[in-house]
Each structure stands twice: as C-alpha cells, then as structure tokens.
Amino acid sequence: MSAAWPGGAELPTEPVGSLPRPSVLQRAVLDAEIGQISAAELERAQEAAVRDTLDRFAETGSPLVSDGEQRRQSFSSYPLGTAPHDGGVEAGPVFAVFADGHHRVIPSLARGPFRFRGWAADDVARSRRLTSRPLKQAVISPSMLSLMVPAEGLGDYSRAEFLDDVVAGCAEDIRRCFAAGASRVSIDFTEGRLALREDLRAPWAGPEALGGFIELINRVLAELPNELRAAVGVHTCPGNDNDSAHSADVDYAELIPELFQIEAGYFLVQSASEKDPDSVARLVGRQLRHLARSGERSAPRVLLGVTNPTSPKLETAEEIRDRLVQAARFIPAELLGSTDDCGFSPYLIDEKPRHGSPDFARDVAFAKIAARVRGTELASEELAGRSTGSQSYAGYGATGTAVVLP
C-alpha cells in the first residue's frame, strides 16, 4: 500500500533503486552461468546481499529502503525472467554508448506475443519478509521495453499488439509491487534524455522517439487508480554504468518541458552531477509554475538528485542542505525533496572503476545515502524557519527573476 508524503515542512527523500552488488555476489553470478556453483548457492549469495543491503539502509536512517536490485541482472532485463532465451529473446541493437566508450545492447524479441516472465513484485515480497520498513521499488518503463520489437512488428504479431501487451504488463507490474508491500514505485526513464541524442551507433534514438515514449508511460499510468498513481514516480538521468554516463551532453532544457507531460505523481530528477544544478531547479520551477497556471492538473512533487553515484567523492550533509535550500528559490518547498542522481549500479556486473572496486563503491553509496538523509533533515529545518508569506509557490523564470503567481 502506498505511503503518505511527509507533512509540514519535512522534505521527502528516497533512493532511486540499484546499489553496487558485492564482489562476492558478482563472482557467484558468473560462476553460476558456467555451472561452477548451483542455483541454491547463488540464491544464498543473493539473499546475503539483500539482507546486508536492508540492514545498511536502516543504519542510514532512510525513510524508505530498497533491496538495491541485488537479485537483478539489470534494471531492464527482469521482465524477461531468469532464462530469457527460452522465451524467444536474443541480443538486439545497441541501446547506449557511454562516455568511456563501452556500450549496452537492447534485448530483442524473436517471436511474439510478449509477456512478463518476471515481476518486480517478486523482489518486493522477498524484502517484505526481511524488514518492516517502508519499501521503495523501481520498475522498467514501457518505453524501454518498446525497443525490443521493430516498427514492422514480428510477422503476424504487429507492433501495435506488442505495445498493448507492454502497457498491460507494465501496469500490472506496478500494481503487483503495491500489493506486495511497496510504499512507492518509480519508473526508470533513462532513455528519455538519451532519445534526444542523435547517435548513429544507437539507431533507435532521436528526438522523434521521445513523444512516443511519453505517450506509452501515460498509457500505463492511466491504467492505475488515482491513489496508486500519486505514489508512482518517473526517474530521469543521463545513465550510470561503470561510473560513466550516456547522455550527459544532452541539454536538460530540451527534456524537462517534455518530461512534465508525463502524468506521474512525482519525479526524480538528476541534478547533482550537472555543471549548473541551479539551472535544473530553475527549469523544473518554470514547468511547475506552468502547470499551476494552466490548471491542467496538480503540480507533482520533484525529488532532486543531490548525490552523484558516478563519483567516489562524498557529499557532506551540509552541502546537500545548501543545495536543497538553494533549489527552494525555484521550486516550492512543499513540492521539493531529494534523491540520488541515479541508481548506483543499474547493471549487476559493474566494476565501478572510478571507485576502485564494487565493494568500496558499496561503502561509498551508503555513506552518500546517509549524507542525503541528514542533509535533507537539515534543509527541512532551515526552510521551516523561513517565512514564505504569500509566495509559497515560488516560481522563477530563466533570468532568475521571481515571478509571483496571481
């Protein structure tokens, strides 16, 4: 069942999803693939990693905890099940080329129809047995799944039929998460920013793709009752794999206005690793002001990224406090919150080269989460002590000049 947002001046904070897998788990996965260990031994390694993750999350004081996707191969592959090739899935075209030169591919559906063979709710249910704390769960987007089938479809299985199946599956995935005990769910939408990057090495990408992605996500959200939709977020970032991004060079000014056409309950927006984090808050504030003036729908909450998962440099609680207080110049405090820029390791096998090892990266991740939690508390206290007067819906234009709403 979804959790209520904090009241008063308290700013919400939550993780995105993934955390670095311990090196022992990464080795166990590789050993299992070549038959060196049994499925039962792999399950024990996964269970140990999940228990450690939940325990260390609790130590940070985080209001919501997560299993850090310790059981997943990647953020995008879990719907394919544990034996995707048995379900007619094969390696497809390039999904993204990262700044360090490595790439990831899109799974390609060899035959229809498409059906979910694994559910995010399975992870929620397992974690629910291990903790009584509120759980956060990340899920795949319909737009990511849409890349598995070409425009011409697969023989008698048309692309329109495929997209109908994707939408139905994604909506069911979210409903199951809440039924299993998740308090909030967010849709990973890393392909949103990447869609605006024209790259011949990733042939699916291009600005024309973004509109179709947004339509698909809205179709999924429309399948959910209002009380659940309010607890469903959409996360955007420029990617994070092996401490490298895939679309950090894409101007946020191109994405943010389009992003807020998605009718989600809240958004998680990467910001800390931007060259100018204030520009992100300013762009977001302008969109919130537009929504308020148009009366189209209630303005959503926005959780800004205040930690950079690609860097081992630790943010302090005081730095995070200052970032949030500064962001409140542009985003109403009652709609503001914090998160991490991205999942810390969206793919299971991740050497975390800038950190030196996945184990050290794991320690760094929990230290960053603890700083985020404490920094958000400090920002809440400081903002609570300020008088907002009649301008609680502070909107600032691109010039930085305050705009008072009528």
Where in this protein do the model-derived segments appear?
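Domain-level signal for soluble alpha/beta catalytic cores
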Residues: M1-P406
